[in-house]
Amino acid sequence: MAGLTAAVPQPGVLLILLLNLLHPAQPGGVPGAVPGGVPGGLPGGVPGGVYYPGAGIGGGLGGGALGPGGKPPKPGAGLLGAFGAGPGGLGGAGPGAGLSYASRPGGVLVPGGGAGAAAAYKAAAKAGAGLGGIGGVPGGVGVGGVPGAVGVGGVPGAVGGIGGIGGLGVSTGAVVPQLGAGVGAGGKPGKVPGVGLPGVYPGGVLPGTGARFPGVGVLPGVPTGTGVKAKVPGGGGGAFSGIPGVGPFGGQQPGVPLGYPIKAPKLPGGYGLPYTNGKLPYGVAGAGGKAGYPTGTGVGSQAAVAAAKAAKYAGAGGGGVLPGVGGGGIPGGAGAIPGIGGITGAGTPAAAAAAKAAAKAAKYGAAGGLVPGGPGVRVPGAGIPGVGIPGVGGIPGVGGIPGVGGIPGVGGPGIGGPGIVGGPGAVSPAAAAKAAAKAAKYGARGGVGIPTYGVGAGGFPGYGVGAGAGLGGASQAAAAAAAAKAAKYGAGGAGTLGGLVPGAVPGALPGAVPGALPGAVPGALPGAVPGVPGTGGVPGAGTPAAAAAAAAAKAAAKAGQYGLGPGVGGVPGGVGVGGLPGGVGPGGVTGIGTGPGTGLVPGDLGGAGTPAAAKSAAKAAAKAQYRAAAGLGAGVPGLGVGAGVPGFGAGAGGFGAGAGVPGFGAGAVPGSLAASKAAKYGAAGGLGGPGGLGGPGGLGGPGGFGGPGGLGGVPGGVAGGAPAAAAAAKAAAKAAQYGLGGAGGLGAGGLGAGGLGAGGLGAGGLGAGGLGAGGVIPGAVGLGGVSPAAAAKAAKYGAAGLGGVLGARPFPGGGVAARPGFGLSPIYPGGGAGGLGVGGKPPKPYGGALGALGYQGGGCFGKSCGRKRK
């Protein structure tokens, strides 16, 4: 005992030094320091004498194994108290070192701790020593001492206790673990509110904002509402705000730590809180779709909805359009659509229809300036269908379709004066706007015509206002509708630029000027009815009634519907050498032609015949090997200078300067529909470009326009009377149905050397009996030749060679049959109408291009060799 008691002061000295450093708040807990220490220490050393958590429970063994509430203490917080000699064990900064339980990690500021507890905690942690158990009396089992040194209780020179388990306290940089779930799966915060948040208080230890410290959040010293925005409505409004059951809205929300801006509140509606969606509860529209965008700022959900709704019902903006007093509208009022400003405006009764049509046109992308047009000259002024469709340079009108230089029309000044249909803008606004809109719907370009290229003389539809005859009485509504329908399918225009096609300008094409071609001037061609009224319209100004003109306009539109190619022979110089030199030529009545290579059979029979002979001849012609029609020279729509498709030449009505077969010339209503139907089945896009519908050799070689016996070459022809005209028109239409080679080709060579040379339109070709009276004008007395009905029936089977081919096999009765696929060529002489086979189809081999160069068989291989397809 003496030795033991003698060793006590030395550890006491160390404890005194330690206590001076740690400044304990209250007595007790340190063995031998104050009453309640280790038995044998100072008086009062009853185990557990001081009633603080962690005090020894007797036998010098600390009872600090369990923390308050029976919870296991944290590491270094009394776990080793049972091994020490003093109550409280070794806890961290050391119960048993004179500190209360409150000095343990996790126990700071719990009642029972002193003001210096935190400092002691900090100092002990910084020292990195657990200040092992005091109990190591020399010779005893000193549980712990300073690491690497003799036990604290060991007397120098004595047997030191077992080296203390150093470092059991909170070492430098150690992290005090927290209670609760901590960080959950995936690194997400735990479900327990507050767990995982930094701070001295482990998350979840203090309920709510601190049961003992109202207003204190999870973060120590951070009351809700002071610098950290409150998370519940009304939060931060007092010391008890946010406490469960105390705050105005029921306290803390699940998963929302108070006082720390991590998650937004979960209550419906935020009442202005900065982390809400800005909407009030109960479905009331919010004050903005985003935080910070209230109503009236133009931003947010309301602004977006309003803008979308405005765009849905409002037209394009801009001054004077919808509404306003904008400039230039439809049809030229002060406003835009139409009238003064607004949609309804003060326009005509058809304003609504015009606006609707314009909108429909604009819907499909009409080019700018079309619908609506410029200031009052588009729909229905001088544009569509004013001066354009119909009107000057439009469809129909001067320079349009029909008109000067159009289809039909006269290349030069017509025989009837300007033919503007009723004056510009005469068509009702509703019909005009609707037609224009429909035309524009498929992409017609804007301007005076379709397309609009100015105001010139003759040429492409809409190119000019050159003098000429118009539709000749066709109703404006029908003309507008037909024009719109034609434009709907993109008619490329049936004529080339004014002057390019020979015959467009008077004098350019021999025969364009009246008198140059026999038959152009009334009386020059035998049998022609002098003074055919009307200039080459479709059907012309000489029709008996406007109804026929309307039908012609409709037919022309239908013809344009399927793409009557632009330009009837777009190669200048169409009629070159041999353009009917010498007029009718010798033997015009007898049918005996002159000139080498004309294809005339000497002794070709002309003159009058009998109906039976004509019928048999036509039947024989139809069954001929190459199915060449008798008299195809001047009977095919639009193939000659004189009798052609309406609107190709400078002639009266149609193709040339002369009166044509029904449907070809001026005023011949029957046949205009046939011409349209002929064009319907595939007139090539470039009707006579090089290699087009008769590039070189387009209208036949020598003897080109029908060769000998053109329209009267079959002997025994009967003079056609007026009743035969209707049959001729019908038959011609039927003939055209099966592909009479398109609408002629006025390309290079088309009317070139030999194209209309001596014999081509010479004696028999267009001579007496060829296009003489009786086969041309209904009611006229014929001079012979094949009756129109018979010739048309022969033509029904689709002769492709539009002219005689030298050396071809004739069919009985005279006349030279055309052989499909033979081109007029400097390489291979004797070309015919190569390029297009029977039925108007390109030949399979070489596509007709080489046929123009004279390669035989170009149109007579395979299916195109005259066999009727099933």
From Swiss-Prot:
The modification 4-hydroxyproline is found at residues 39, 75, 105, 207, 220, 223, 244, 338, 402, 408, 518, 539, 637, 646, 662, 670, 715, 842. Elastin is formed through the cross-linking of its soluble precursor tropoelastin. Cross-linking is initiated through the action of lysyl oxidase on exposed lysines to form allysine. Subsequent spontaneous condensation reactions with other allysine or unmodified lysine residues result in various bi-, tri-, and tetrafunctional cross-links. The most abundant cross-links in mature elastin fibers are lysinonorleucine, allysine aldol, desmosine, and isodesmosine. InterPro entries: Tropoelastin. It is found in: Secreted, Extracellular space, Extracellular matrix. Its main location: secreted. GO terms for cellular component: elastic fiber; extracellular region; extracellular space. Residues 1-27 form the signal peptide. Keywords: Disulfide bond, Extracellular matrix, Hydroxylation, Repeat, Secreted, Signal. This is Elastin. It comes from Rattus norvegicus. The gene is Eln.
